[in-house]
Structures are given as structure tokens and as C-alpha cells.
């Protein structure tokens, strides 16, 4: 099966883990006499959108860590299409979403991966914001009181 790279591919209209495509690292390593003892590919995913059970849209940023000594990696366009298809499935929690991504990518590339949540959500503040709506001060031509100097 050929991957989606370089081809026009319709955006999935349902959850589509089958769109994931592996890339063998053998071609890049062949005749290079490389030995991998450590290293990792890190994929930062800045736009992961998903729905919870109440159909509330959530946004997270995740980081996928694939060991450099894995036999396969995931083709980037197929990963992007897969991630976009997540919006068609409901998840109980971020943990369930991460577990789902992890399971499908690990099955594809035949190795264990690590996924981190790299998005730090801002806590809502209970402080009141006071807005001054007094616009009575109109600067005169030679009035420099409204000029900020650095």
C-alpha cells in the first residue's frame, strides 16, 4: 500500500486510524553502517483538537517520542490526517485520547512510544477586571501627558 505523501487525499470524514502509514528506516540506513544506541524522534503536535462526551471541543498540544532505533517511523502527512480525524470520535478524557493515539501509532511502527501533554492550560482567574471607560481626557496639541517615554 502506498502512503498519502505527494497525493491528493480527502480529509477524513470519520475517525480514520487506517490512514496511518509506516515508513521503513531501512532505506535511510542501508549501506551507512549506522549503530543507534540512543536517540529519539520528537514530533510536537500543536493542533490536536478533540471532542469530549458532551461534544465540547478541546485543544491540546502533544509531543510524540519515537525511539531512533525503531524499524519504522510514521509518515508525516498520514499522521496529520489521522490527528485531524480525531475530531470525529468522542473521548472520555485527554488520557483516553493519548492512549488511542499511542495504541494506533505503536501498532503501526511496531515499537513503544511516549506521548507527553505539552500544553499548559491557563487557569481561569476569579479576579475582577476593571475597565476605565472615562474618555474625558483629550490631549491638546502640546499636551505630552499621554506619551509614554522609554
Where are these regions (language model features)?
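N-terminal intrinsically disordered, cationic/polar leader segments
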Residues: 1-150
